[in-house]
Amino acid sequence: QLGKELYTAEKSDFDKGHMTKREDVQWGETLGIALNAANSTFYYTNAVPQHKDLNRDIWRSLEDYILHTETKQNELRICVFTGPVLSSSNPYFITPINGKQIQIPFLFWKVVVFQKEDGKLYRVGFMMNQNKLLQENNIIEVLETDDQIFNQFKDADTYQVNVSLIEEMTGLEIPNAIDSYNDTRNKKLVLKEIDIDPELESDSIEYQLGFIIENLNL
């Protein structure tokens, strides 16, 4: 597990992309439990190198949107799984670290499992690609691959995908649930800014985001 030496290296334009956000686990029966849970996210084992332009855009917004908008409006109880796709097809960082070439994951996934009013569990999957951004900024050495799965994600965007595709790419078995999205095509998500009611104070319990995500199926 690499730490500061990766994020301070020459040509490193990475954020420490938290897989699990502090806010997601900051809860518990006591304040101490909640604080310990929040602090548990500040380890390098919970961070992956993500290009700043992607980490701070729709990928970061996706979970906020689901938690604060969809969850609130539909009274959903959700559980989020997330991580990088680790593969021999991942490209090499242009700068050796400690004299070694380091592969950088360029695909990241997120699965949201939630319960609807019918009491049944549903799940949706998302995939994000940073390969194009890394290439354009000369951060990685281009690694050619004929892997058709990886080649589905050429743009630096976030897509809604079948959970089965995430399972195929990661080798993981996601908890079984009803798939809300069954299209075989990967659908690009679009972040659209909206106007926030100026009368709504920032400390209001009626938390409101300044954007919506179009093309999202839950």
Give the label of every model feature segment.
Residues 1-59:
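Betabetaalpha-Me/HNH-type nuclease active-site subdomain
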Residues 19-24, 47, 56, 64-65, ...:
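An acidic- and aromatic-residue-enriched active-site/binding cleft used to recognize and process polar
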Residues 25-33, 60-65, 90-95, 125:
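A short secondary-structure junction signal
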Residues 38-39, 68, 98-101:
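A generic local secondary-structure boundary/capping motif
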Residues 46, 61, 158-161:
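Generic recognition of stable, solvent-exposed alpha-helical segments in well-folded globular domains
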Residues 56-63, 175-179:
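Acidic/polar loop patches that form or flank catalytic/metal-binding clefts of enzymes
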Residues 65-71:
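Short, glycine/acidic-rich hinge or "gate" loops at secondary-structure transitions
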Residues 72-218:
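C-terminal, well-folded lobe of enzymatic/effector domains
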